[in-house]
């Protein structure tokens, strides 16, 4: 349940990126990074970067492609000396030529923040956007540079203010039948992402096990 509802925690990020993609004709390439401390591989036994961190970016890209199924899926995984997965790589492609790559790992050293770092970049036709969800400014470039949006406040008059406020108000509107359940937060969206994760995990196993066990 937690994983299926995890898209709600990134609602602000999805809204901002969806708005840019809609207004600019979609994206050509998306690349997503989520890196966490190396000790996560041992602190969370049985968890993998696919399911613990990459899942959030899969939800986000799912909303950008309007839930369309990818026609290409491939993945690779790396394992540490203890045999725990510490890096997951994934590639998804869609019929219109859109591509998305994902990197999620437990690789950052102790000197870095315990929260690690996240980054997402979207490239379209003559524009690009970069999102740092941790923290969360959004930067956009086209012919000009758009200054970062450093606060969780959208200037659109039809948009609620703040990530938590948006989630609560959206929930209230949905239960009162004032608006439909947002794409990316529905039960079927969670099932679709879980299906993608299953296919990515299988693809990574079929691609061979990369490790530094003999180093």
Whereabouts are the PLM-identified features?
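C-terminal helix-rich "cap/oligomerization" subdomain common to oxidoreductases
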Residues: 95, 170-215
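Single conserved hydrophobic/aromatic residue that forms the stacking wall/gate
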Residues: 1-8, 12
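A short, polar/proline- and glycine-enriched secondary-structure boundary/capping micro-motif
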Residues: 111-115, 140-151
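Active-site loop of classical SDR/Rossmann-like NAD(P)-dependent oxidoreductases
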Residues: 156-169, 185
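NAD(P)-dependent dehydrogenases' Rossmann-like dinucleotide-binding region
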Residues: 9, 17-42, 53-59, 69-80, ...
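Short glycine-enriched, charge-decorated loop/helix-capping segments at active-site entrances
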Residues: 44-49
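Adenylate-forming
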Residues: 13-17, 116-118
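Contiguous beta-strand/loop segments that form the cofactor/metal-binding neighborhood of enzyme cores
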Residues: 55-137, 165-178, 214-215
């Amino acid at each position: 349940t937690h994983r299926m509802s995890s898209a709600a925690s990134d609602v602000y990020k999805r809204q901002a990126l969806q708005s840019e993609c809609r207004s600019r004709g979609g994206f050509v390439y998306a690349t997503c990074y989520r890196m966490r401390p190396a000790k996560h591989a041992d602190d969370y036994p049985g968890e993998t970067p696919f399911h613990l961190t990459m899942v959030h970016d899969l939800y986000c890209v799912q909303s950008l492609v309007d839930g369309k199924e990818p026609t290409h899926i491939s993945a690779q995984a790396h394992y540490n000396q203890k045999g725990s997965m510490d890096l997951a790589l994934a590639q998804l492609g869609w019929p219109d030529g859109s591509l998305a790559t994902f990197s999620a790992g437990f690789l950052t050293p102790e000197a870095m923040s315990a929260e690690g770092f996240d980054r997402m970049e979207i490239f379209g036709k003559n524009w690009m956007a970069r999102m740092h969800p941790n923290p969360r400014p959004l930067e956009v470039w086209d012919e000009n540079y758009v200054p970062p949006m450093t606060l969780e406040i959208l200037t659109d008059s039809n948009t609620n203010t703040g990530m938590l406020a948006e989630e609560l108000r959206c929930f209230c509107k949905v239960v009162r039948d004032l608006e439909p359940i947002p794409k990316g937060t529905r039960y079927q969206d969670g099932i679709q992402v879980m299906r993608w994760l299953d296919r990515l995990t299988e693809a990574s196993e079929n691609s061979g096990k990369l490790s530094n066990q003999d180093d």
